[in-house]
Amino acid sequence: MMPLLLLILLSTRNLLGAAQSQESPVAGERRALDLTTVYVLPRSEPINATVEHKCREALASCYNGSEFQPLHDDGPIRPDPYRFSTMIRFKRSYGELPLPIELNDEFLEQLSLLHNNTDQLRVLLTLMRTSRASDWMSFLGGYTQCDAPKSVVFTCVESVCYEHDLMRLNYTTDLFTENVLGLDVSPPVLSVLVLLRNNHTKAESVVRVPTSSMSLLDGTYNLLRTILGHMSLDTDLIGVLRSYRDRFPAVFSVSDQIKITRQHYRPQYQRKRP
């Protein structure tokens, strides 16, 4: 429903901090949110056509304090259950030998998440991006003995099994195709909290999926800054979040043109021949 760029639904009147309006907000006054235009930060081109109207109506109902009817009884909106976020994209490993799997309570809990789970493939992809990724990669390495490529796995519910090529799945940049609960901002690590659930075994667990993309943190900062400014709320939280940005390792730097460049990269100049 919402792209990774974090869509902000704002009224055209208050989009740029009342830069186009001469009226100043009255203290304590709560204005209704007029969802006439949809914008993506930091740009300001309207993109109404890309946002489902039900999303705008739900946000307006929530913001204005009216009765809210969820779009679905449970879980996030998934127009296509076979779309997966690039956050959990399968990454092929080369030259790694299978290692013994540590059978502890954590691993057994993860097995209960997979057993007869109709969303088994999504859960498996997510687990392969957690701290127990090496265990699952070792487990999948055994498929090569059956003359199947490493990227091919089989998911089974009861006696029905399906074959999947993890390199050819329908991946999308939409982060919220997963059960995202929030962000874990703990410099030098930035993780996404994802809820995994098995309706068959009634098992559920929240896992951390590490990410090295600072665009997620920057998008969250832009989101909170705009909403708090629109509602005339205290901006101390914005200052704290901004300070977090400087506490992450200087792997990436953002230039004035909002381009991501490696900090250790230096242009090489050719010597002039005499």
UniProtKB/Swiss-Prot annotation:
SS bond partners: 156-161
GO cellular component: host cell Golgi apparatus; host cell plasma membrane; membrane; viral envelope; virion membrane
GO BP, sorted A to Z: fusion of virus membrane with host plasma membrane; symbiont entry into host cell
Superkingdom of origin organism: Viruses
One Pfam family recorded for the sequence: Cytomega_gL
Location(s), subcellular: Virion membrane; Host cell membrane; Host Golgi apparatus, Host trans-Golgi network
Key words, A-Z: Disulfide bond, Fusion of virus membrane with host cell membrane, Fusion of virus membrane with host membrane, Glycoprotein, Host cell membrane, Host Golgi apparatus, Host membrane, Membrane, Signal, Viral envelope protein, Viral penetration into host cytoplasm, Virion, Virus entry into host cell
Broad class of the protein's primary localization: virion
Keyword Glycoprotein among UniProt keywords: yes
Disulfide bond among keywords: yes
Membrane topology: Peripheral membrane protein
Alphabetized InterPro entries for the sequence: Cytomegalo_gL
Domain gL betaherpesvirus-type: 51-251
Signal peptide coordinates: 1-21
Family under the similarity heading: Belongs to the herpesviridae glycoprotein L (gL) family. Betaherpesvirinae gL subfamily.
Functional note: The heterodimer glycoprotein H-glycoprotein L is required for the fusion of viral and plasma membranes leading to virus entry into the host cell. Acts as a functional inhibitor of gH and maintains gH in an inhibited form. Upon binding to host integrins, gL dissociates from gH leading to activation of the viral fusion glycoproteins gB and gH.
Subunit field text: Interacts with glycoprotein H (gH); this interaction is necessary for the correct processing and cell surface expression of gH.
Protein name listed in UniProt: Envelope glycoprotein L
Lineage of the organism: Viruses, Duplodnaviria, Heunggongvirae, Peploviricota, Herviviricetes
